């Protein structure tokens, strides 16, 4: 049995999956954001209950908005203050007497999609989230590639390519990132970036869904904004694809619901790739909010 946890800033979602990768148990509770002992006890309690209900000791995987420090195993996260700097994996293993695997929630999203029946035959799958932030995860042969420092897939903290910057025109804003660097693509390619770029150019604070609805009516500012955003996004993705050369790209997050992406991106990206390179297949995520739990559970599958 495979146990998966999606530990977020407001809730903990749990799922148990059998050998056929079918979900057989679910639980959702509030995240004890500021009480570390309660956070650990909550996770342990859910696991022990699942063990009793299912009659086995499941393999435990946890996805969270952050990562483990590759040097000492401490948790690096800002969304769950109680866990920041703590040794969550080691403390859970000590209480449970079994191995626990922890990974970034974007990696879990990518793994969930890579294990979908439609993609299991693909050699490599790049999952990209265009939500509150921009990030991703890379899966090779059914397993997450995290890199030496556990930061592989932190694509949002790469910098804007110069031609993407030029595509924004003379009034291009230089946003400062939460990591204290300037020009990180997280602040431009995310849903949040989509909104703050619109506010920068047009002086109006609109939600992404409002801008997209205006675009559908042919409203001039929205049409101009979407065209500029698409070109910038295409250049940045071409840059990423040139370095990683994935077989399939799966888009998640709020902006992934904008159907125009799947029409526009392939032809725009093609202009910015090497002449010998083909644009990888770009598809919409299938598992939505369940992806984090699925991917966390599948961290322990040995393909």
UniProtKB/Swiss-Prot annotation:
Pathway per the UniProt entry: Cell wall biogenesis; peptidoglycan recycling
EC number annotated for this UniProt entry: 2.7.1.59
CDD domains assigned: ASKHA_NBD_ROK_NAGK
Catalytic activity as recorded in UniProt: N-acetyl-D-glucosamine + ATP = N-acetyl-D-glucosamine 6-phosphate + ADP + H(+)
Domain of life the protein comes from: Bacteria
Keyword Heme attributed: no
Annotated binding of Zn(2+), by residue: 157, 177, 179, 184
Family: Belongs to the ROK (NagC/XylR) family. NagK subfamily.
UniProt function note: Catalyzes the phosphorylation of N-acetyl-D-glucosamine (GlcNAc) derived from cell-wall degradation, yielding GlcNAc-6-P.
Name of the protein: N-acetyl-D-glucosamine kinase
Organism for this UniProt entry: Photobacterium profundum (strain SS9)
Gene this chain is encoded by: nagK
